Amino acid sequence: MSSDPGYQAPVVTVSSSIPRRGVGDSVLIVPVVTRDDAAAVLAAAPFLDKDAVREIEAALKSLGATGGEGQTHRLVVSALPVASVLTIGLGKERDEWPADTVRRVAGNAARSLDKVAAVLTTLSALDLEAAIEGLILGSYRFTEFRSAKTAPKDGGLRAITALSQESKSRARDAAQRATDIATAVATARDFVNTPPSHLHPDEFAKRAKALGEAAGLEVEILDDKALVKAGYGGIVGVGKGSSRPPRLVRLSHKGAVRTRTRGARTGGSKRVALVGKGITFDTGGISIKPAANMHHMTSDMGGAAAVIATVVLAAKQKLPIDVIATVPMAENMPSATAQRPGDVLTQYGGTTVEVLNTDAEGRLILADAIVRACEDNPDYLIETSTLTGAQTVALGSRTPGVMGSDAFRDRVATLSQQVGENAWAMPLPEELKDDLKSTVADLANVSGSRFAGMLVAGTYLREFVADGVEWAHIDVAAPAYNSGGPWGYTPKGGTGVPTRTMFAVLEEIAREG
């Protein structure tokens, strides 16, 4: 991450035609489809003349191109002023193109042009915002810890010209929105990809503060002494084993319409609480994890990263609602001072908990944060976390699980699917609460069963949500971190999920309540 707050996106401009000058080093990205078993140029008019289209299609025919989704070909086209053309396949021709298909193929195109500084594209004629988001997210790279020996010699993608016939004002607003959303996702990725040696709780809090203040947010940070004094037993308990003490960060966007006299929210303005798990590294504590793949636990603050990025995005987009993020941060380490299996701690608000497994630490810090967030009297609460390995077992590496109050849970899942993050609604059966009974405290932090682990964790969190608050818990244990190869606009490493889901929910609440 640079010394400037947050990720620096490529410069985006929108044009109604291909410039005749100044694009000699640029690559033009052109979508093609499968038509009669061959590749055909899509969205050509009015940007490409007939000579350019004929030249492109003739070259593709000679190469045996079919226009299959993700298929790319680099061509030199004499009829165009650009250095080269990259065709990107969309698959079989259709009347309408889903936004995430456009986003995904734009990401594929950007990844195939990783050494190109400037691009133009007609993909934006299909969906302006999706094309810009896909290009920015597909071009993302994390190089902060590369020395001169291995750092890329080029600067990556720095300029995007999106070709569109939208009105100037509409195009300008859409391009800015897309850039802001992609920047938020990339910022969350940067946090996740930063190693725990450089992103311990205090440093994480400082970076969150810098981002928040740059966006005009109100920022509050509680250090370890303040946490002890206020009774945040979950956060303090988890952080006891580390030499790097915990923090609680609060970031507030006050966008709701207020009365002139008392400054109170008007009746139609909503308040949304965001809560994100910020375990900067998770060894499991005394209940230590296996060594294999423990290095992936650098991503155990993926929920916090997404929440911070989302509240900053809400401020940039000036959403007319209040959004208050409550982000607990701790490092879960084994040591002589660490909490032990069998210890009892008191969560913020007074609930006592028997800690049967110190590797179920996320729910302990989240419970504190949820109770604190509910003191702000939100209408809605969204919590997200890399909470359980059971999410991966149940839903795989790309599908978040959403639990919570039924109507709001379904609303979150639906919007997540619309933006391409593809969360799936899951139940919280009442009988699972019995599995969290303790003989010595109000609750145990785990059940005695290996079944339904994702749902049991959600059931635990439900105990701390105030009555009357519509809430959703998004488990992104696997989706927050791509341990495999890149695909679409998703790189290896931090993904930024579920930033776009949460922002989509905030936008809908701002529109509809």
Curated annotation (Swiss-Prot):
EC code(s) of this entry: 3.4.11.1, 3.4.11.10
UniProt keyword Cell inner membrane present: no
Bilayer-crossing regions: none
Keywords, ordered alphabetically: Aminopeptidase, Cytoplasm, Hydrolase, Manganese, Metal-binding, Protease
Reaction catalysed by this enzyme: Release of an N-terminal amino acid, Xaa-|-Yaa-, in which Xaa is preferably Leu, but may be other amino acids including Pro although not Arg or Lys, and Yaa may be Pro. Amino acid amides and methyl esters are also readily hydrolyzed, but rates on arylamides are exceedingly low; Release of an N-terminal amino acid, preferentially leucine, but not glutamic or aspartic acids
Cofactor(s) demanded: Mn(2+)
Disulfide pairings: none
Cell location: Cytoplasm
GO molecular function: manganese ion binding; metalloaminopeptidase activity
Pfam assignment, any one: Peptidase_M17
Active site (UniProt): K289, R363
Highest taxon of source: Bacteria
Broadest EC class assigned to this enzyme: hydrolase
Ligand binding (Mn(2+) 1): D282, D359, E361
One GO location term (cellular component): cytoplasm
Residues bound to Mn(2+) 2: K277, D282, D300, E361
Claim: Hydrolase is one of the keywords in the record: yes
One annotated GO biological process: proteolysis
Cofactor note: Binds 2 manganese ions per subunit.
Family: Belongs to the peptidase M17 family.
Function: Presumably involved in the processing and regular turnover of intracellular proteins. Catalyzes the removal of unsubstituted N-terminal amino acids from various peptides.
Matches recorded under HAMAP family: Cytosol_peptidase_M17 (MF_00181)
NCBIfam families: PRK00913.1-2
Protein name (Swiss-Prot/TrEMBL): Probable cytosol aminopeptidase
Originating organism: Mycobacterium sp. (strain JLS)
